Curated annotation (Swiss-Prot):
Biological role stated in the UniProt entry: Hemoprotein that functions as an electron carrier for membrane bound monooxygenases involved in sterol biosynthesis.
Location(s), subcellular: Endoplasmic reticulum membrane
UniProt family annotation: Belongs to the cytochrome b5 family.
Pfam families per UniProt: Cyt-b5
Phylogenetic placement of the source organism: Eukaryota, Sar, Stramenopiles, Ochrophyta, Bacillariophyta
Residue numbers binding heme: 45, 69
Keyword Transmembrane: yes
Name of the protein described by the UniProt record: Cytochrome b5
Amino acid sequence: MSAEKEYILDEISQHTTTESCWLIIGNASNGGPKVYDVTKYLDDHPGGAEVMLDVAGQDADEFFEDIGHSKEARAELKNYLVGNFKIDAATLAKMKADAEAKAQQKNSGTGIMLIVLMALFAIAYGYYQTQMK
């Protein structure tokens, strides 16, 4: 298949099984999102097939980058390139909404942690004060 072919999310999201496993990896800073058919690599992946199947049919760039793959792994990935990820208006809107929801979810956890930390500090300070008397 030509690396020039473009795929939309609806097409990519149909490839989520051991028979056909596609991933979107990449961003604007490294040549744009690309589509990879990693089906033949599932059994050879050091982290196991399940890791890739968990993010199959979707944007897996964050997961790929968080792992810190080696230069060799990045070079190997090029063997599975099938095309470019074409972001249409509907997909872009969905991706933005998902990113905002994820950021909001992340921030809500931070607020709770801060409250718990402050409460623990107040309890520890109160205990310290009673012991000093």
